[in-house]
Structure formats: C-alpha cells, structure tokens
Amino acid sequence: MNTKTNFRWVICAMLFMATAVNYLDRQVLSLTWDEFIKPEFHWNESHYGTITSIFSIVYAVCMLFAGKFVDWMGTRKGYLWAIGIWSAGACAHALCGVVTESVVGLHNSTEMIQAVGDTAVLISTVSMYCFLVARSILALGEAGNFPAAIKTTAEYFPKKDRAYATSIFNAGASIGALFAPLTIPLLAKHLGWEMAFVVIGLLGFIWMGIWVFLYDKPEHSKYVSKEELAYIEQDKELDNSSSEDLDTPVEKKLSFRQCLKYRQMWAFVIGKFMTDGVWWFFLFWTPSYLNTQFGIKTTDPMGMALIFTLYAITMLSIYGGKLPTLFINSAMKKGREFDPYAARMKAMLIFAFFPLVVLLAQPLGRISPWFPVILIGIGCAAHQSWSANIFSTVGDMFPKSCIATVTGIGGMAGGLGSMLMQKVAGELFVYSAATDMTFLGFRGMPAGYFIIFCVCATSYLIGWVIMKTLVPKYKVITL
C-alpha cells in the first residue's frame, strides 16, 4: 500500500461494538427483573442483590484468569472465545423459567405468579439458582472483554492515543446502556422477557462472524499500510517488549505472583476496587431506584426518557480519553516533557471531583426525578472517563506481553468491589424498608439509597489519593 490507512479505527469500532453488546447483555436483567421477573418468581431486593453480587464475584475471579487466557490464546481467538461464551450465557437466561416450572411441578408462568406460601418460597429459591447459573456463564465470557480490548488497543495504537481509543470503545458501554431501555422493555413486553435475553444474546454471534474476517495483528494485517504501521509503532523503542511476537511462547511474561510485587500493579488494583462498584451499582440499580422512589417503570415513556437521558449524558465520557493527549501535546508545544502517566493522573483527578454531584441526587429528587437522573449521569460519565484512563495506565507501564494479565487482575479487584457494593446495597435496601430507618432527613428505602450515593460520590477521590501515593511518578516496568 502506498497511502496511509486508518484501519486501527476500524478495529476500535469493533471493540466499541463488542463492548456495546456486552452491556446490552448485562442490562437485560436489570430492565426486566422489577416488572416482569420479580412477580413471576416472587423475588425481593435481596434475591436481586444476591444474583448481581454473585455475578460480580464470578466476573472478578474469571477476570483474573481471562487476562492470562487472552495473553496465552492470542487476541483473535481469545476474543472469539469470550464473546461466544457470554452470548451463550445470555441466551441461557431464557431457560430459567422452564427449568423452575419443571422443578416446582407447575405448568406455566400464571401458576407461578399465583403461587403462595411454601410454593412461592420454593419458586423464588429455585429460580434464583437457575439465574445464578446463567449469570455465571455470562460473567465467565464477559470477563474476557476488557483484557482482550485493552490488549488490542496496545497492539493498534501508540501510547499517546491509547486513552482516547479506550474512551471510544469504552463508550460502547454507554451506547449499550443507552439503547437498552429503548429496546429491552419493549421486547419483554411484546415477546416475553425470555425472548429479550435471546434476541440480545444473538448479537454477540453476529459480531464473531465479522471479527473472524477483520482482525489480525497490525504487522500481519492486509488492511494496514506501512505508513499506518509506522505510526502505530512510533514509540516502539520505549517498549522493551514491542519487538517481540505477543503470542509466542519464548517472550518474557509475568506470573501472577511477579505482577503483585510491583506498586504499579497495586495502584491499578486499588483504583479498580474503589470505583468499579459505583458504575455497576448505577447500571444494575437505577431502573429499580426510579420504580421504588418515583413509581416510574422502565416500560413507561417517562422511564424510557429518564434512562435514555442518563446514558446520553454518560456518552460525554468519550472526550475523557482525549484530555491526557491534550495535556501531552500542550507540554510538547512548550518544549517540556510530559509523561503519559502524569497526564492520565491529572485527568483522573479532574474526573474524581465530578461524582461528588451525586451527593445532591436525593435532596434534589424531592423536586423532580430528572435531577437525580442528570446527576447520576454526570457521575457515570466521570466514571467512564476515569475508566478509560486507568485502563491506559497498564499499557503505559507494563510490557505488551502481560497487559491482558494485568488488566485481568485489576478487573478481578473491580469485580470484588462491585460484589461487595451490590450485596451491601441489596441488604441495606431490604433493611431500610423493613425498619423504616432514617438518614439525613430521608426515611425507609430512600435513606438506604442516600447512604449508597454518599459512598459512590467519594470513592474516586479516595482511590486517586491511594494510587498517587503508591505510584507518584512514571516508571516503566522492564523484564
């Protein structure tokens, strides 16, 4: 090829679509459980909290091994395995009702809804375990998405562009969450909640067919010109492993134990642990929050508008990955060196302040539900901007050969933090409603939500301080 190509952005678009499908699959339960699944299986907030927390812990544990698996299998095959498993898991949710009916000895959903006493308890228990199995399969596959995506970004983008590329594909989470309330409740309403899982789950198999024909490593891709390859590898000499084949067994790699001896690893791990649970809480609980506190269902026009607005605001995060590049370019124009880690930490500090607006969600919610939705949307946008940059710190400081492994370890920490958040939230909401507890002028379940919002608002600043303390300056790890 004699002209410069931009195929790296096609790959970025594929990562974007994979992440969008990932979050669509993840959102089906949160948008159907309160209105469709809860009455059929006699669930309460504790059941839902248990399911989301188990999903988080399975996701966390699998993230630890998913990164290592992707490093071993290679980006192309590793991504195919991941999305194939999670798509199968998504479709498997549709079988939970049939299995529950068979175990309990009932014949249809109407009989399950009308059940009372011990039968209702049995239905709730059996169905919960069925969903736990399906959810675990989903978590197993979804755990591979971000390790594979971050590894792909490191292969196709120079360091200065990685946060921006990450913010673009990470925005797929917002797009998936954005389209979810416009499609999933309607599918559930007209086709049944089971078909909502199946239809959304099939999207992953379509993505797999496209990925097979498009992806190859840039140095082997027929779609990447020499000029584009030179751009991709512009900082090659700064990466001690970038001249090595990422998928060959002779390259130097880090074991789990070796990774844990580096402060850079612990900074990433703690940053993920402190903040991932916030995003997952908003993702899993906002539809229920609107229904519980304001009586707004996701199938209502108002509910759709509110959820759409929340994730439309979250889309602003796409600019969050551009901020470090602006800092670096500005410093270079002035003749000063500005390392990528310093640029990312400066950007992350800015983003850490925005979630503080969530502290006002409950007080302003007394005026209109639009206020908490807008404020939560700002918090979600800040999280996604933070997430794009914290993921990119891995590529800045670790060799390419172990990026997926390190990302997986950090993802495990984020999943554990999320598991803790989901379980505590579910139990707190049941407790606050049962005891009519009060907190800063709010009573019952709204008081429980206010407590969780306070935790969400402050987690980022605490996480940033710990990260900066552990790794005050940029230092590349060499093997």
Predicted regions and their residues:
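Extracytoplasmic
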Residues: 10-45, 100, 145, 282-287, ...
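Residue-level signature of mid-helix packing/kink "hotspots" within the transmembrane helices
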Residues: 27, 56-64, 143, 177-178, ...
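Extracytoplasmic gate region of multi-pass secondary transporters
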Residues: 29-31, 257-322, 383-387, 391, ...
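Primarily marks hydrophobic transmembrane alpha-helices of the MFS/SLC 12-helix fold
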Residues: 79, 131, 345-348
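C-terminal ends and interior cores of transmembrane alpha-helices
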Residues: 84-124, 349-366
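Cytoplasmic helix-loop-helix junction between adjacent transmembrane helices
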Residues: 130, 134-174
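Helix-loop-helix hairpin linking two adjacent transmembrane segments in secondary transporters
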Residues: 173-222
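Multi-pass alpha-helical transporter architecture, strongest
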Residues: 207-215, 358-364, 449-479
